[in-house]
Amino acid sequence: MLWPALRSVLFQLDPERVHHLAHWALHRVPLAVARARRPAPIPALAVRCMGLDFDGPVGLAAGFDKGDVALPGLFGLGFSHVEIGTITPRPQPGNDRPRLFRLPEHRALLNRMGFNNEGMEACARRLAALPPAARLGPVGINVGKNKVTPNEDAAADYLACIERLHPYADYLVVNISSPNTPGLRQLQERDALDRLLRACVRHLAERAPGKPLLVKLAPDLSPEALDEAVDVAIAAGAAGIVATNTTLSRAGVERHPRAAEAGGLSGAPLERLATDVVRRCYARAAGRVPIVGVGGVMDAEGAYAKIRAGATLVQAYTGLIYGGPGFVGRVNAGLARLLERDEFSTLSDAIGADHRQGGGKAAG
């Protein structure tokens, strides 16, 4: 009950300042404290995906830790995995401030950060300095291109990040779907996506055979373009689909004073759209690769909807901002109750249940 009161105080401050304060605090969590405070895993929620073991489905989405590497503190919150990034080859400041806005009436955020990060070298140094024990679960690294890099040269940026960062990643994600880097989403078009992913998959396979490389897609693709992107990604050798990034749509928040701000919308207004994209990706992939569901995971019900729609794992960021330190524990406890209600023995049994007749009792 303390979190709502603390949140009301923090929400009086600039959102980016609060973000930095949170990182400052998380960096100072000793590993022993993180282990002691980490919620106990629930065996029914464990899942194996892409050759990796996850003690639950709920991970931290890219965008929160952009290379500061506060792993013990983040794992101490209960996340089963942490995705760092987006990381670019060279440091870049991102877009001008203000660039992060809260829409508390809608439990949403709107951002136009623009891949602000200190670059792959700084990230690699920090990851190299971490003791192995600090990795309380799989660590993903989400990579992108620098803003000044033209799309025709984008592959070089992604390959540079893969080259430098793959030793420290359990999996990598190619981010081509942020709305805050001009022209980036054009890399989702068929030919560009095919060339980029084939180059990335080949480069990683030569250096770390078997290490998974995923691609993160936008929620704003047409159904036909989404189907095509999934087909291209699988044919190119991607190990999974991350669905989705933030949306350019303002559906549900049209009348909010911030609705006219440029940037991507995340949080509760994205939940239904992102779940629909997960559902379509799962159907199109037809079991060939797993789907990681992201977008509007604000509670156990939202996470469960994505799992039943086909997500093997889910990720949250905005849900953490609104839900506070106890967010993951509450989601996991709620998921366990929902599995029991629908007579599933394990989370794996519920993945894609909405696509199967007789796949447990009707959700909701």
UniProtKB/Swiss-Prot annotation:
GO terms for MF: dihydroorotate dehydrogenase (quinone) activity
Single GO biological process annotation from the record: 'de novo' pyrimidine nucleobase biosynthetic process
InterPro entries, sorted: Aldolase_TIM, DHO_dehydrogenase, Dihydroorotate_DH_2, Dihydroorotate_DH_cat, Dihydroorotate_DH_CS
Binding site for substrate: K66, N111, R112, M113, G114, F115, N175, N180, N245, T246
Catalytic class of the enzyme: oxidoreductase
GO cellular component terms, A-Z: cytoplasm; plasma membrane
CDD domains: DHOD_2_like (cd04738)
Active site: residue positions: S178
Membrane topology category: Peripheral membrane protein
Major localization class: membrane
Highest rank taxon of the organism: Bacteria
Keyword annotations of the record: Cell membrane, Flavoprotein, FMN, Membrane, Oxidoreductase, Pyrimidine biosynthesis
Localisation: Cell membrane
Endpoints of the signal sequence: none
Cofactor(s) needed by this chain: FMN
Metabolic or biological pathway, per its Swiss-Prot or TrEMBL entry: Pyrimidine metabolism; UMP biosynthesis via de novo pathway; orotate from (S)-dihydroorotate (quinone route): step 1/1
Quaternary organization: Monomer.
Primary role: Catalyzes the conversion of dihydroorotate to orotate with quinone as electron acceptor.
Protein family (similarity comment): Belongs to the dihydroorotate dehydrogenase family. Type 2 subfamily.
Protein's name according to its UniProt entry: Dihydroorotate dehydrogenase (quinone)
